[in-house]
């Protein structure tokens, strides 16, 4: 057992260590898929990101980083989420060559649990345009759920108690838990790709509306095929709810209702199987204690790596 004087401080925040490990560990999958220009660009960008993160972490540790550098280190795990999500098909192909999707297995599991296929039936059972638009709006709120709760903590606007802002554990813990939730989902997508019901037709009777059309446009522009199980939408929403209850309790009911609508909308809109949503709840819930265990392991001395409030 180490005393505080014997404990070695980590070289970077846990979130940065985890990000570097993920980038380095999955890099071979980009190389294994062949030497196409897109893969080479993605691999070069990944190598560059690792070196940049290591450089920023080194400057942070030496206390010579600037204000913008601190912000980059604080937010890098969430800033890189869209890029990491977008490259998932390349990782899937690097692992298996021709990607084999596991939708038949998930559909069988779905039927064994529910005795039906909710993703194809819920909209026809409750064909309300108002309900449809509400659930699709909740589904679209996923993007705000990723960034708004951490931002409020970062600005010191919502955390209870006297210690607010970037110097608190609340921001670090929230970012790390969300990051763990994402990375668990991403690894599941790579090793067990599932397309989701959206690729097998529109749910019968689903009402049309501007919000649904917006969601469809977002998915068409930015979704990665094979990234359905578990639902990262539901996983991240669940993680954010748990962290909001812990650190921003005034937002708890709002985030709970949005998350509930998001999970229902994922199935109602035909974007996910119901078991995708259930698996997302499980991942999102387990991500919180897993993130805590990682931080205790990698930051045993409990240093404060996030930026102090105010300019450098």
Model-based region annotation:
Residues 73-77, 147-191:
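Interfacial segments of alpha-helical transmembrane regions
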């Amino acid at each position: 057992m180490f005393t505080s004087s014997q404990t070695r401080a980590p070289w970077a925040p846990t979130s940065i260590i985890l990000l570097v490990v993920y980038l380095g560990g999955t890099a071979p999958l980009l190389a294994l898929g062949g030497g196409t220009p897109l893969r080479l660009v993605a691999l070069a960008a990944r190598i560059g990101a690792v070196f940049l993160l290591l450089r920023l972490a080194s400057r942070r540790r030496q206390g010579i980083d600037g204000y913008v550098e601190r912000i980059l280190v604080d937010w890098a795990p969430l800033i890189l989420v869209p890029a990491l999500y977008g490259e998932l098909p390349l990782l899937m192909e690097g692992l298996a060559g021709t990607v084999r999707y596991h939708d038949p297995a998930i559909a069988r599991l779905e039927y064994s649990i529910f005795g039906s296929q909710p993703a194809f039936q819920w909209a026809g059972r409750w064909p309300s345009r108002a309900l449809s638009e509400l659930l699709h709006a909740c589904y679209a709120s996923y993007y705000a759920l990723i960034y708004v709760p951490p931002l409020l903590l970062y600005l010191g606007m919502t955390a209870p108690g006297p210690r607010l802002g970037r110097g608190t554990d609340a921001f670090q813990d929230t970012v790390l838990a969300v990051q763990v939730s994402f990375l668990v989902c991403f690894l599941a997508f790579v090793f067990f790709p599932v397309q989701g019901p959206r690729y097998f037709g529109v749910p019968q009777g689903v009402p049309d509306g501007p919000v649904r059309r917006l969601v469809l446009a977002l998915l068409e522009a930015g979704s990665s095929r094979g990234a359905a199980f578990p639902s990262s939408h539901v996983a991240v929403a669940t993680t954010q709810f748990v962290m909001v209850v812990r650190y921003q309790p005034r937002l708890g009911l709002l985030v709970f209702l949005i998350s509930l609508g998001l999970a229902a909308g994922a199935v109602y809109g035909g974007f996910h199987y119901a078991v995708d949503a259930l698996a997302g709840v499980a991942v999102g819930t387990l991500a919180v204690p897993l993130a805590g265990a990682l931080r205790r392991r990698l930051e045993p001395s409990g240093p404060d790596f996030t930026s102090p409030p105010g300019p450098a």
